[in-house]
Curated annotation (Swiss-Prot):
GO terms for molecular function: actin binding; phosphoprotein phosphatase activity; zinc ion binding. The modification Phosphoserine is found at residues 509, 535, 549, 604, 792, 867, 930, 935, 952, 1054, 1062, 1118, 1122, 1279, 1331, 1346, 1423, 1448, 1463, 1468, 1535, 1547, 1554, 1599, 1741. It comes from Mus musculus (Mouse). Glycans are attached at S1321. It comes from the Eukaryota. This is Tensin-1.
Length: 1888
């Protein structure tokens, strides 16, 4: 077996035979000569092993000589600095003072051969062809460089970190000796856990031989009962040799993402518990620290449910870890094990707040230069994506005691963070690693964090780093500069070089980790199997001279000049800003299984079935089976040639999956621009490089590249080959391009799948029908994950079965129904799109250079960086995972990883959030859980839509990967914005044909009609998993923009301690939060932020916080949420997406609107684009942009209106609809003709690939904007609208009415002036009506899209009617101040959702307005939900801004948080849940604390009305403005009031939900929020007055034609989807209905989930047994939770319930078969709210009000025991005691709800409690403080009245407690609350 020695045999205590200890039954391995001694032949191994340590440690005398030290060095004895003369050992270099020489006791240990070379030196290979972050292509450098640093000098020796530089401990020496001498080390850690480890320097031939022997041994001993976990880079030979392999690799010497640790443990536990004979094999090549991390983590994991019979196993694991791993492990690995242990045990609480890194202070200057000092620079990675690169600091020796690297504005960090500090050698193309540190923000609870030398990887064993040295990180909760930190400035001797264009600085090797190593297999095909990427010829791979790995040679893309474009590069001044160094993720090409390939026979059907059952809980998608499947397939076709030409490759972001291992990994790095694939031969250096693209590597949640193996191939030398290859052996050049790496047979693999998924994949994958679906080749599928895969695949893309991939159980449950369709479908579309489409769109904002490597087809898929959302999601997921990890929590032992962790109420704030948002969602929660789930997963599998696939609720179809989802827009308009960046190959990428449209591929071949239905992954909703939602909610709360940036900290001492000071009032986050990248201007940042693509994988995850933030304007005191949200990933948004034109700064037009996708303005404004004057540039980039803007702006851009370019792209002159000058269409702008935009005449949308091409033709001043908008907004990702909806009818582009004038909305401002002015039409995205394909996967073509799916569409775009849901990010406008509104220059931007669009997106980001701008959001009728959180960032903007959101009638919910003042057009059932309109129109906006609180808490209180302000209101309790019923008059035609706007988390009673708003005074409604559609109770803003005269515009709902076209045959969602109503309202509506009547609403307890309330014929037995008395009609209304996950939606807690692609699908299925419900659902034919209104009297009767209750936020001050005292005396006494207390108690914001049931307090932030309920019969008194004392400790310092209520203590009849509160919202005074409580109490007393 090649394994002759086990580490255990090194123990002196256990002299064992040469083969090491073998567990009982272990077959003797084949006899092989001992390798333990490098040269040796082999005396008795036992003796040699025992003696070796002694030999190594034999004491030897030092040979000291006196030396004058020029640079400071610490004394090895006293640790003090040696300043002048000292002694140094000539042998071991041990240094000490002369006086300390006598005290030296440590033996002299000469350095090993591997220590002769500096361990951390990295050099850039000489022949660097491409200058790029990770793109350094090596010509012939003989050295392999490792990011980790060591230079391997001897092939047989692997340097291992030493815990002590001078003396080796026994364990260390033994371990090193073993590692140096043994090729293979196989150890049975326990009887069922085997560790197989090879040194990274193992000879390749021997390594392969040993691999085979290990495989033989495992098969002979364990048969098929072993599962191999590959912890290092992927190798084809591993998957060929073993039937079951899960890829969990990560870079050597690094630590895996926390989520990956969770996934590994879950997978191990599931496998081991499935069968007592199952064993786990941990395979690792490189440092054994990786095995140690897994063993230690599993030790803690299994300890949770520890049992006595496992005690020995745990002891064995502990001993193995301590003896074999600790000596060689890295500090960060130990830190992560500690994190994992703490999170499991609860000792570490999850911190979901966003942390902004402002300063990195290095105390103690390392001596890396001969004269002392060093030249450090930092690179910061988030989820292994570079997000920041600092300048190079030149620090002379002895000049400084510390150095501070300042990042301004603060860099937003979230999730797994890796910070590497390098030393750039002087005049040498090399860099040394000074230190490396990894941490996870969830475990950071202090704003000052210090890591000592022993905590720093690399430095802990480096003498050059002073022993007293430490590194301090200074964080804050906002990007604004921290006050009081001026003393941190460096001295004059420190200079900074910002020339980050040097390839050495930008070089990043992590991109390649996920690639396959090709050196492991002989069966490598030398060419691709046909022109898979759209090129005419197959690409021949030629051996790379350097390492022999082959890589396709591509001439399609000119080599970039070695000299970077400085304009672009300088952008990265002190940050990666993603523009400069963010590297896009490596695209993985997922190769579909060849169409005809037969399923590998590796596993029998029974085995597969069993495995599937076991692993189903993991959420392993079939797509994910990739690796395993691949292995099997490889086995079937060893030659690697597919039996059938491989259908097409899916580019899986971040990882190249090559089944045959035929290709080295390729990666597309967005490093600056070098790596951009060049479009049409244009140089890729433009600013809009991919790097900016959101699409940085998709990192799976785990934070590593998403692919199966999260990191680069070669990680075994994580970096060793950095410079040389992409890890995959491709020269970087090739790597840049997305090269379709096809190995002949690659199973479609999701880039990274969770282990579970992988497991599940095994069986699932099995016998799929040949997947040969046609896909439009070269589509840039915009997968929800936001990656645009440039898919140049053959026409056929394999599709994975579309089963409701839920777990085995759910699948089985639905199997009946599914079988038929599954059989019908050639292959179910992979659920590639874990991310919500929007996300994907945003994410994939293609850079202008989207062009694929080949001009034609392969659009580079834009790798996405982990978007902020994704990262947040990943954190949320992590949180959920931690909760879910507890073995007990799993519903079934085997399904611990069940897709959605239960959303049990008490779980944790996180638990209430749905899984990570869309972004990861594409994969089942589990996936996310697994940590692998790459956001790009979805990408991994092509989103193929079988062209003929029938709609099926279960049919989770992704858009064809190739098809541009965004293109799918049916309407030109949408396409216009949507040109998908990826479709760089433009012509070839015809959008998948729209449902109604026949796609006219601009390029002939490869066009495929994509089925309108999307895979669930695509749905934003689906994408959002419960966990994500729960987590997000929590995060959202925590990171509410309104929340003050955080107390300012003054550093009290240098140790990094800070004193908290009260935050300055209103220190808004920088309006445009630039992405952490400094270079980006606020506008850019906003754009980026809005632009999901800008974020690293921000899919839908969209953490709730973000969603909230988006929804709620951030308060002035807090930075705009957009800012907060903008993840570092922003840096990754392609500049082009921002509208920056590559190469020519002058051309760069910064699109202030930030929403790259401008909404198409109503027709009148169609041709015009509005621009807004930019703020003062904050960075070079911004200034450049500004400059560019200035020029163009000055000019009359009218002609270049956005729409024009679109039109031009086709060369058609589009008629302007409202008299917009035809001239507006200019010559083809960057939108290339190939862009898929619909031509005026044609119904099909052409591919938009080149739309963005920056070089294509002169840009008109506006064009850049257009491009940017397109790019960022919809380009790469078809505009959400467009994408989301493949509508059957085209939408006018830019408002131009192409073929469907009816759909285009009339521009809001038809005024000539607007036309005359250069307005960028905000590219309103019209959702084409009736496009079922919208992101929601709907049940059938005719079924209405599920209302809630596009939960987060950004509101700036208009959704065309019928578009089920706008992808969440797609529609987003820029979020954050500065980009408000799509309109710039004061022109209103209109965002309209056309009728019928069930849901625009959950959080349409409201149009953010800049002061003075008007943005109007119009949702057309029938759109059930515009978006949950249209970012209402404008809340922060000056109040002068007005954003008009008009929801047209019938739109059930505009967006949960429509931003901007929005008028709800009558009929719209619900305006955005948290629309924040106007300046700080809502209390939350005004009070940061409120919004913070609300957003911070994941709990969204039910939308109960606020308290009536004046008693006058009580008599009738009827206020014209308030209407409990969703369809109250407010929604009737003509009524400006919105229907049931979603409450804004109850904060401040601004729930403008359907509940009455009591903010009215004396019954007089003054623009009550309800009336206004504002979420706030304030009556200051009336939407109507901000809207232009609507009579001038043709509102979509006013057009009969439009209305007619918008109708869905079965769209009844408006009757049963009432997102805003509360549980009580649902009961009131249903209690008198027939059994089967139901309503679905948005859950207030579990963010992102839905509540199903249905009437049943009889109450459950438990109710009758309890003998409850009273009105039983309420008990007949039962409530079910519908959770959302990557696979869609499903009833929670029902194992036999499948996942559905949309709410509509779930509803219609249950109307046919009840499944787990008590009875079938009865689809309503009319709105129940109408019926209730008909039958009930006045809408706001006193009874209704009391029944409904009222609520608002107040400050909870204290609870004081009163014994039996009550009445005013109790209130007075409690107040006196509280005010006299020392210290005075801190007040906490709580949600105070009063109803007929009693008083309920909810601590949204869960600081004191979760929820407390005081039944009405226990409340004895409520009143204000009789002495009218005030509470002074309020946020703003204004005194607040105190009030309280007295209630009996639980379980007592005499003892009382008085609960004191202070009013928080001026609109909800204490008197109103007290009056209402008294009224309720009085009413209850009368009843009794």
């Amino acid at each position: 077996m090649g394994c002759t020695v086990s580490l255990v045999c090194c123990e002196a205590l256990e002299p064992l035979p040469s083969c090491g200890p073998q567990p009982p039954g272990t077959p003797p391995g084949p006899a092989r000569p001992e390798r333990c001694e490098p040269g040796g032949a082999a005396p008795d191994p036992r003796r040699r092993l025992l003696l070796q340590p002694e030999d190594l440690e034999a004491p030897k005398t030092h040979h000291f000589k006196v030396k004058a030290f020029k640079k400071v060095k610490p004394c090895g004895i006293c640790r003090q600095a040696i300043t002048r003369e000292g002694c140094v050992c000539k042998v071991c270099s041990f240094s000490c003072h002369r006086k300390c020489q006598a005290k030296v006791a440590a033996p002299c240990v000469p350095p090993s051969s591997h220590e002769l070379v500096p361990i951390t030196t990295e050099t850039v290979p000489k022949n660097v062809v491409d200058v790029g972050e990770g793109d350094c292509r090596v010509g012939s450098s003989p050295k392999n460089l490792e990011e980790g640093g060591s230079m391997r000098v001897s092939p047989s020796i692997q340097p291992q970190p030493q815990s002590q530089p001078t003396s080796l401990s026994r364990n260390t020496s033994v371990s090193r000796a073993m590692e140096d001498s043994c090729e293979l080390d196989l150890v049975y850690v326990t009887e069922r856990i085997i560790a197989v480890s090879f040194p990274s320097t193992a000879n390749e031939e021997n390594f392969r031989s040993n691999l085979r022997e290990v495989a033989q041994m495992l098969k002979s001993k364990h048969g098929g009962n072993y599962l191999l976990f590959n912890l290092s880079e992927q190798r084809p030979d591993i998957t060929k040799l073993h039937a079951k392999v899960l890829e969990f690799g990560w870079p050597d010497l690094h630590t895996p993402a926390l989520e990956k640790i969770c996934s590994v443990c879950k997978a191990m536990d599931t496998w081991l518990n499935a069968d007592p004979h199952n064993v786990v094999v941990l395979h690792n090549k490189g440092n054994r620290g990786r095995i140690g991390v897994v063993i230690a983590a599993y030790l803690h994991y299994s300890n949770i449910s520890a049992s006595a019979d496992q005690a020995l196993d745990r002891f064995a694991m502990k001993r193995f870890y301590e003896d074999k791993i600790v000596p060689i492990g890295q500090p960060s690995q130990r830190r992560y094990v500690h994190y994992f242990s703490g999170l499991l045990s609860g000792s570490i609480k999850m911190n979901n707040k966003p942390l902004f890194l402002h300063h990195v202070i290095m105390h103690g200057i390392p001596n890396f230069e001969s004269k002392g000092g060093c030249r450090p620079f930092l690179r910061i990675y988030q989820a292994m994506q570079p997000v920041y690169t600092s300048g190079i600091y030149n620090i002379p020796g002895d000049s400084q005691a510390s150095i501070c690297i300042t990042i301004e504005p603060g860099l937003l960090l979230k999730g797994d963070i890796l910070l590497k500090c390098y030393h750039k050698k002087f005049r040498s193309p090399a860099r040394d690693v000074i230190f490396r540190v990894q941490f996870h923000t969830c475990a950071i609870h202090d704003l000052g964090v210090v890591f000592g030398k022993e905590d720093l990887d690399e430095a802990f064993k480096d003498d050059r780093f002073p022993d007293y040295g430490k590194v301090e990180f200074v964080f804050s909760y906002g990007p604004e500069k921290i006050q009081g930190m001026e003393h941190l400035e460096n001295g004059p001797s420190v200079s900074v070089d910002y020339n980050t264009s040097d390839p050495l600085i930008r070089w990043d090797s992590y991109d390649n980790f996920s690639g396959h190593r090709e050196d492991g297999m002989e069966e490598v095909v030398g060419h691709t199997q046909g022109p898979l990427d759209g090129s005419l010829y197959a690409k021949v791979k030629k051996k790379d001279s350097l390492n022999g790995s082959s890589g396709p040679v591509t001439t399609a893309r000119p080599a970039l000049s070695a000299t970077p474009n400085h304009v672009e590069h300088t952008l990265s001044v002190s940050s990666d800003s993603g523009n400069s160094t963010a590297s896009t993720k490596t695209d993985k090409t997922d190769e579909p299984v060849s169409g005809a390939t037969t399923a590998p026979a590796a596993l029998s059907p029974q085995e597969k079935k069993e495995l599937d059952r076991l692993l189903s809980g993991f959420g392993v998608d079939r797509e994910k089976q990739g690796a395993m499947y691949r292995a099997q397939q490889l086995r079937s076709h060893p030659g690697g040639g597919p039996t059938v030409p491989s259908p097409g490759r899916h580019i899986v972001p971040a990882q190249v999956h090559v089944n045959g291992g035929a290709l080295a990994s390729e990666r597309e790095t967005d490093i600056l621009d070098d790596e951009l694939p060049i479009q049409d031969g244009q140089s890729g250096g433009s600013m809009g490089t991919l790097s900016s693209l959101d699409g940085v590597t998709n990192t799976s949640e785990s934070g590593y590249p998403e692919t199966l193996s999260p990191l680069t191939n070669g990680l075994d030398k994580p970096y060793s080959t950095e410079p040389v290859l992409n890890g995959g052996g491709y020269p970087y050049e090739a790597a840049n391009r997305v090269i379709p790496v096809h190995s002949s047979h690659s199973a479609p693999i999701r880039p990274s799948y969770s282990a579970q998924e992988g497991l599940a994949g095994y069986q699932r994958e099995g016998p799929h029908p040949a997947w040969s679906q046609q896909v439009t080749s070269a589509h840039c599928g915009c997968d929800p994950s936001g990656l645009f895969r440039s898919q140049s695949f053959p026409d056929v893309e394999p599709q994975l079965p579309q089963a409701p991939t839920r777990g085995g159980s759910s699948r089985e449950a639905v199997q009946r129904g599914l079988n038929s369709w599954q059989q019908q479908q050639p292959h179910p579309p992979p659920r590639q799109q874990e991310r919500s489409p929007l996300q994907s769109l945003a994410r994939s904002k293609p850079s202008p250079q989207l062009s694929a490597e080949t001009p034609v087809a392969a659009l580079p898929e834009f790798p996405r960086a982990a978007s902020q959302q994704e990262i947040e999601q990943s954190i949320e997921t992590l949180n959920m995972l931690m909760l879910d990890l507890e073995p007990a929590s799993a519903a079934a032992p085997l399904h611990k990883s069940q897709s959605v962790p239960g959303a049990w109420p008490g779980a944790s704030p996180l638990s209430s959030q749905p899984l990570l948002g869309s972004s990861r969602q594409s994969h089942p929660l589990t996936q996310s859980r697994s940590g692998y789930i790459p956001s790009g997963h979805s990408l991994g599998t092509p989103e193929l839509v079988s062209s003929g696939r029938p709609y099926s609720p279960y049919d989770y179809q992704l858009h064809p990967a190739g098809s541009n989802q965004s293109f799918h827009p049916k309407s030109p308009a949408s396409s216009t914005f949507l040109p998908s960046p990826h479709s760089s190959a433009g012509p070839q990428e015809p959008p998948a044909s729209l449902p109604g449209l026949i796609a006219q591929p601009q390029l002939p071949p490869k066009e495929t009609t994509s089925d309108p239905s999307r895979t669930p992954e695509e749905e934003p909703l689906n994408l959002e998993g419960l966990v994500a939602h729960r987590v997000a909610g929590v995060q959202a709360r925590e990171r509410q923009p309104a929340e003050p940036p955080g107390p300012l900290r003054r550093r009290a001492a240098s140790d990094g301690q800070y004193e908290n000071q009260s935050p300055e009032a209103t220190s808004p986050r920088s309006p445009g939060v630039r992405s952490p990248v400094q270079c980006v201007s606020p506008e850019l940042a906003l754009t980026i932020a809005l632009n999901p693509g800008g974020r690293p994988k921000e899919p839908h995850l969209h953490s709730y916080k973000e969603a909230f933030e988006e929804m709620e304007g951030t308060s002035p005191s807090s930075p705009p949420h957009s800012v907060a949200r903008s993840p570092p990933g922003l840096a990754k948004t392609p500049l082009s997406a921002l509208g920056l034109k590559p190469h020519n700064p002058a051309d760069i037009l910064l699109h202030p609107t930030g929403v790259a996708r401008r909404l198409i303005q109503p027709e009148e404004d169609e041709g015009e684009e509005v621009t807004k004057p930019p703020e003062e540039p904050r960075s070079y980039v911004e200034s450049v942009a500004r400059t560019a803007v200035a020029g163009p702006r000055a000019q009359d851009v009218e002609p270049k209106s956005f729409s024009a370019p679109a039109a031009h792209a086709y060369g058609h002159e589009t008629p302007l609809r409202n008299g917009t000058p035809g001239g507006s269409f200019v010559s083809p702008s960057p939108l290339s003709t190939s862009s898929p935009i619909l031509s005026a005449d044609s119904t099909s949308v052409g591919s938009f690939p080149s739309v963005v091409s920056s070089d294509q033709g002169p840009r008109t001043p506006f064009q850049p904007m257009l491009d940017s908008s397109i790019r960022s907004g919809s380009l790469g990702q078809p505009s959400p609208a467009a994408l989301s909806y493949q509508s059957s009818s085209p939408v006018p582009v830019g408002g131009s009415s192409y073929n469907s004038p009816d759909y285009s909305l009339q521009p809001f401002s038809s005024s000539p002036e607007s036309q005359g002015q250069p307005q960028y039409s905000a590219a309103s995205v019209h959702m084409v009506p009736g496009s079922p394909q919208a992101r929601h996967r709907t049940v059938g073509t005719n079924t209405p899209p599920s209302p809630g799916f596009g939960r987060r569409a950004v509101n700036p775009t208009m959704a065309a009617p019928g578009s089920p849901s706008l992808s969440h990010r797609q529609v987003m406008g820029p979020s954050g101040p500065g980009f408000h509104g799509n309109v710039v220059s004061g022109h209103p931007a209109s965002a309209a959702t056309t009728p019928g669009s069930p849901s625009l997106g959950r959080h349409p980001v409201g149009s953010h307005q800049v002061p003075g701008l008007h943005s109007s959001v119009v949702t057309t009728p029938g759109s059930p939900s515009l978006g949950r959180h249209p970012g209402a960032h404008q809340g922060n903007l000056a109040s002068s801004l007005h954003s008009n959101a008009v929801i047209s009638p019938g739109s059930p919910s505009l967006g949960r948080h429509l931003g901007g003042s929005g008028s709800v057009v009558p009929g719209s059932p619900s305006l955005d849940r948290h629309a924040a309109y106007g300046g700080y129109s809502t209390p939350e906006d005004r009070r940061p604390t409120l919004s913070r609180q609300s957003s911070a808490s994941g709990y969204q209180a039910p939308s109960t009305p606020s308290f009536p302000v004046s008693p006058a209101y009580y008599p009738g309790l009827s206020s014209p403005a308030t209407s409990p019923s969703p369809d109250s008059a407010a929604f009737r035609q003509g009524s400006p009031t919105p229907a049931l706007p979603e409450k804004r988390r109850m904060s401040v009673g601004d729930r403008a939900g359907s509940l009455p708003n009591y903010a009215t005074i004396n019954g007089k409604v003054s623009s009550s929020p309800v009336a206004n559609g504002m979420a706030s109770g304030s009556s200051t803003v009336s939407f109507s007055h901000t809207l232009p005269d609507f009579s001038k515009y043709s509102m979509p709902d006013n057009s009969p034609e439009t209305r007619a076209k918008v109708k869905f045959v079965q769209d009844t969602s408006k009757y049963w989807y009432k997102p805003e109503i509360s549980r009580e309202q649902a009961i009131a509506l249903l209690k008198d209905q027939e059994p089967g009547a139901f309503i679905i609403r948005d859950s207030h307890s579990f963010r992102g989930a839905y509540g199903l309330a249905m009437k049943v014929s009889s109450p459950p037995p438990t109710i009758t047994q309890q003998g409850k008395k009273g009105d039983m009609t309420h008990e007949l209304v039962r409530h079910f939770l519908i959770e959302t996950g990557p696979r869609g939606v499903k009833l929670k807690g029902c194992p036999n319930e499948p996942n559905f692609g949309s709410l509509s699908a779930l509803v219609y299925q249950h109307s046919v078969i009840p499944l787990a419900l008590p009875c079938k659902l009865v689809i309503p034919s009319r709105d129940p709210t109408d019926e209730s209104k008909d039958s009930s009297g006045p809408a706001n009767s006193t009874t209704d009000l009391l029944k409904q209750g009222a609520a608002c936020n107040v400050l909870f001050v204290n609870s004081v025991d009163m014994e039996s005292l009550t009445g005013p005396q109790a209130i007075s006494k409690a107040t006196s005691e509280t005010l006299a207390a020392d210290p005075t108690p801190a007040a906490t914001i709580v949600h105070f709800k009063v109803s007929a049931q009693g008083i309920t307090l909810t601590d949204n932030q869960r600081k004191l409690f979760f929820r407390r309920h005081y039944p009405l019969n226990t409340v004895t008194f409520c009143d204000l403080d009789p002495q009218e004392r005030k509470w002074m400790k309020t946020e703003g310092g204004a005194p607040a009245k105190l009030f309280g209520f007295v209630a009996r203590k639980q379980g007592s009849t005499t003892d009382n407690a008085c609960h004191l509160f202070a009013e928080l919202d001026p609109n909800q005074p204490a008197s109103a609350i007290v009056n209402f409580v008294s009224k309720v109490m009085l009413s209850a007393g009368q009843k009794r």
